[in-house]
Amino acid sequence: MLKEQLKEVEHRIQAACDRAGRKREEVTLIAVSKTKPVSMIEETYQLGIHVYGENKVQELTEKYEILPKDIEWHMIGHLQTNKVKYIVGKTALIHSVDSLKLAETIEKEAAKKNCVQDILVEVNVAQEESKFGLKVDEVIPLSLIHISEPTRLDVIS
């Protein structure tokens, strides 16, 4: 069943790439593995999926320890500063850096672990109090720090 579902997803990705004039290899499929058992991840891994997204630090670290080491892990959920130490160096990309404090904490932890951590910055452009994300006026200071000083953060977007 998973094999057929994966074929359908791949077909849809290819169709979207064709419509957008992009090559399939320019697009990364991230299988969201949150709440899924290790056995299901192992099955999709055998089908060729090697990039997974988790939204909970504890689940990510548990799965990281027992699944193949060539899996590329992405942190896709809200990340608290007190949990940064558990995922820096284990994740290829942190998708939800939503504050300067969080960026600074990731930077410090990456320095401790002597690694560079790729991140995506989440910006709250609507400036809604109920939403996560940097305020628009915080983006420039983060960008200036990243440009003017050598850092352990690689801001992908």
Give the ranges of each region predicted by the language model.
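Anionic-ligand binding region
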Residues: E129-L144
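Charged, compositionally biased N-terminal leader segments and the immediate start
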Residues: M1-R22
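Glycine-rich anion/phosphate-binding loops
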Residues: S96-T105, I140
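N-terminal active-site wall of soluble small-molecule enzyme domains
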Residues: R19-R22, E26-T91, L100-L102
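Single conserved hydrophobic/aromatic residue that forms the stacking wall/gate
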Residues: I145-S157
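Acidic (Asp/Glu)-rich catalytic clusters
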Residues: P68, G89, E107-N114, L144
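Aromatic/hydrophobic pocket-lining residues that form the small-molecule binding cavity
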Residues: L2, L6, L60, V139
